Swiss-Prot record:
Signal peptide bounds: 1-24
Protein name: Putative defensin-like protein 128
Keywords: Antimicrobial, Disulfide bond, Fungicide, Plant defense, Secreted, Signal
GO terms for cellular component: extracellular region
Chief place of localization: secreted
Pfam families associated with the record: SLR1-BP
Any single GO BP term: defense response to fungus
Keyword Phosphoprotein: no
Keyword Protein transport (UniProt): no
Family the UniProt entry places it in: Belongs to the DEFL family.
Length: 74
């Protein structure tokens, strides 16, 4: 019984620490290239400008845009 109690307390403590680390981290999005997106260029540009990850996406009107996802700065 004592071991089970210790394990439960450890798990609750661990989950509390994980929640504290992720709290307040919001993902922001920004379009960097509005047309003719190239995968390598998009990734590189997003990394250099915003320290994020960029991917090309096809829009409804069939354009390819570079969407950069990065941690918001406060």
């Amino acid at each position: 019984m004592s071991k089970l109690t210790n394990v439960v307390i450890f798990i609750v403590f661990f989950l509390g620490m994980m929640a504290k680390e992720t709290q307040g981290q919001h993902i922001c999005h920004q379009i960097l290239l509005n047309n003719n997106c190239d995968g390598a260029t998009c990734t590189s540009l997003c990394d250099k400008q915003l320290q994020g990850t960029g991917q090309c996406y096809k829009t409804v009107d069939k354009r390819f845009i570079c969407l950069c996802n990065y941690l918001c700065r406060t």
